[in-house]
Amino acid sequence: MNKLKPIAVLLLLASLAACSLPDSAERELTVLYTNDEHGWMEGMDEANGAANLMQLWQDNEGYSADAENFVLLSGGDNWTGPAISTWNQGESMVELMNTMGYEASAVGNHEFDFGLEAIRQRSAEANYAYLSANTAWRDTGRLPTDLGLAAYEIVDTAGLKLAVIGLTTRETSTSTNPATVGDLDFRDYEASLRALMPEVASQRADLTFVISHVCLEELEPLIEQVSDLGIDLFGAGHCNELVAKRIGDTVLLGGGFHFTSYARAKFIVAADGSWQVDYSTQENRGAGTDAKTLEVVERWRDQSSAALSEVLAYIDGGVARGPLLDQLVVDSWLHADSTADIAITNAGGIRAALPAGEVTLGDTVAILPFDNTIVAVELSGEQIAAVLEEGARPRIAGLRRVNESWHLTKTEAPLRPTEKYRVLVNSFMYAGGDNYDRLALSDPEGYDTGTQYGEPFRQWLRSLETSSVQPIRFNPNP
């Protein structure tokens, strides 16, 4: 496909003009849509990875990366996930998406997980555009083109001109590390689209798409609110929803998550610009593997395995993602720091299960993939209680609930409102993520230990001194 250079927002006024095809022939275009891939190129289960999906597209849709009558789009959150992607800060996923033939991705909140320099590098490596019309620098109000982001791009394919616009969830300010994105403003969706559309209209596109990292709960009302703007398709993201339906004159797609499924829409565009469409969703199952895509996956698997193959422990039965694993992680913080009274982490920072059998360094990178560090704060009992009340899904070590009060597990003493305690949290929380703003407000002088938040868990696993003949088993109901 011939992809024009992404165009930044200029906010100039232009008249809305109808466009038409240059001749009387109908044009066909199939949109293939995924989102929230999160680095799962190998697949969550056998035979549902990226190479399987690519083969499925070839078998079911007739797709190829250089086909002129397809456009492959993503709703964002491309890379944070298993070690094959997290260890290299998404570089492997960009190469994979280049190979598969993506044209554009919305910017998801997790695109910022590894810092602004990382997203700048990834966008430079990508043969596709990273799009967000509602992201701007706070000090200038300008689109962060210096990070490689664009508001929209124009794509010429199948004899059609497409305008593809991106949106980023407004939750990004607290759903990635707030310290990373503190200089960025994630603006109102409707206002951003209305400000941009005069410029988009001046491009005289045949079809206008909005790909977004926005959940259906917000996206469906937005489609109604901007129904006058002539947007033909919206794509969803962020909430892992699989959907293909029509709202008025607009098609809505959501591709699910982790390459386990996709959504599609096939447009037939007449010479007068009118169109017909059919749409559907499809699970990624039953296909073989595309050799070219598989080669990329295997090469990155080999590279990550070489660095991350150290066996830390042997587990009988594994531990599912959830409360037990969360507790093991936060308990390990206190195990590593005997000076701390309490440890609190957010459940959202724990992203994968502890597998059965060998547990490698790579497995723990997938479980705890972020660049967060452990921060020590001094909080009163009253402040701790408030943090636990306000923060999202806290996981706690060093405290237990007795009736209506908190008690220290070391001493069984009740948490005293005015007494100070040393509390370990992660840097995402200390920066205000997941509604933990009170931490820095209560102790502005929090001490960043510099310890990556997964390191105590790795040290603890090593300390168990397990083996293949003497694995440890964790009781889910102690």
Task: Specify the residue positions occupied by each region the protein language model found.
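Acidic, metal/ion-coordinating pockets
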Residues: 20-296, 320, 324-335, 343, ...
